[in-house]
Amino acid sequence: MNVHRTKLLGASAGVFLFAIIYGWVIFPKILRFMISKQVTLKPGTDIRDLWSNTPFPLHFYIYVFNVTNPDEVTAGGKPRLQEVGPFVFDEWKDKYDLEDDVQEDTVSFTMRNTFIFNQKETLPLTGEEELVIPHPIMQPGGIMVQREKAAMMELAAKGLSIVFPDAKAFIKGRFMDIFFRGMDVDCSSDEFSAKALCSVFYTGEVKQAKQVNQTHFLFSFLGQANHSDAGRFTVCRGVKNNKKLGMVVKFADEPELAIWPDGGECNNFVGTDSTVFPPGLKKEEGLWAFTPDLCRSLGAFYQRKSSYHGMPSMRYSLDLGDARADESLHCFCDDPEDLDTCPPKGTMNLAPCVNGPLIASMPHFYNADPKLVADVEGLNPNEKDHAVYIDFELMSGTPFQAAKRLQFNLDMEPVEGIEAMRGLPKLILPLFWVEEGVHLNKTFTNMVKYTLFLGLKINSGLRWLLIMLSFVGLGSAGFLFYQNSDSLDITLPPKIIKETNNKVADSNKPNEPPHFAADTSIPGTNPPNAKSEKRERY
């Protein structure tokens, strides 16, 4: 009986230890190993196919700030803004000219973004709405000449007056013309100042301009970026080291940028190309990606737990930080040694990146210096509409949903050399903001659900079942040991009564019945057996 109880106890303890070790140590390691072998950019894998040609479009929203009092602003007044949008586009991402380097475990490719107007989702807007915005060539051009080539201001002012006759600081145009179809730039004049101005169009320095013929160009914010080269990347494939999956090694065939001063950390590539992330990240590491539009790597950091279609995930968020307060961001200042040259909190100076007086921020200056909001009318920053967020599953490296939001602003200032710009106020004027959003549908979430989470649920159920069974076994063994100890027979030893020879002492004692020694035999009788007593348990 004791052998069975001992076996039951040992087996139960073994099951308990197995459930703990397998459920919390061995199985997660096996699962991570299996994921690491599947999630690579090796040719022929499902991940490679999904990564190179995204099988679904992202949602791309554009919101434009219509200036309702342009004449007042031209005279130095406070801008009043009206947000118009969203104008909705389907954004398709693909990668072409892929070249693998097996030895370095990298793949090089050219990124391409294609925007297709989604008229149905844009309703009631049509894209033909007339909007008033700062002149997209005169204002940036005049400001940059004043800052960097003041000696050429007279020549530039004359050229602008010829190429854009009767131009004002603000222009009116249709949304699709401003952003995609383009606004006409007439470079047909033989005047020297006009030719000098137009030379930057012919040389390709104005990347937003498309040459139509020998003398005319079309300028738009996004037209040239549509279905065209968005940069040449080299990233890690993650075959040799899964932790480096998607990490940017080169951009434009360069191992680092040469944009920011002092060759500091700001020129380094940190993170992926934003279309893939390595599996098995720790939440404290953050999600980093290089963004060519900003010439910068941005990191999103853990905020809280979240869920998507019933699957647990982690919510990450980001902002542009405060270059003055954060020493690691000092290299984004014009002069890292002079903090007065740093952009305001929550903004980033894009001039070194785009060669124009542009400032990046979160929409409506969310999480930025409150003065920026106070300088204009019509802004209402809030987390729900304007924060950047990502709901991310760490083990598989899957972003379930995300909203990448960014606002572009004009770093406006008066320009003495151009009559139409002399009275402008000095402030940061919002132009437009965009949102690039993704929400995985059931087809792709089910791939994660039935490969990852189903296995995790089975493992969780199995380990708790084994733990419960081990507790039942331990309890049963304990009960059997207890029951056995409760029925033990204990034989009491006989009492020995010694006879004394001290007569004097005995005479002083009261009369007592005679005592006989327990081991003394009475003639003619047999000694009785010692009685057994069952000890009662108290």
Swiss-Prot record:
Membrane topology of this protein: Multi-pass membrane protein
Sorted UniProt keywords: Cell membrane, Disulfide bond, Glycoprotein, Membrane, Olfaction, Receptor, Sensory transduction, Transmembrane, Transmembrane helix
Cited function: Plays an olfactory role that is not restricted to pheromone sensitivity.
GO cellular component, one term: cytoplasm
Disulfide bond residue pairs: C266-C331, C295-C353, C333-C342
Protein location: Cell membrane
A GO biological-process term: lipid homeostasis
Transmembrane segments: 8-28, 461-481
Glycosylated residue positions: N66, N213, N226, N441
Ranges facing Extracellular side: 29-460
A Pfam family recorded for this sequence: CD36
Cytoplasmic topological domain: 1-7, 482-538
Source organism superkingdom: Eukaryota
A GO MF term: scavenger receptor activity
Region (Disordered): 501-538
Family the UniProt entry places it in: Belongs to the CD36 family.
Descriptive protein name: Sensory neuron membrane protein 1
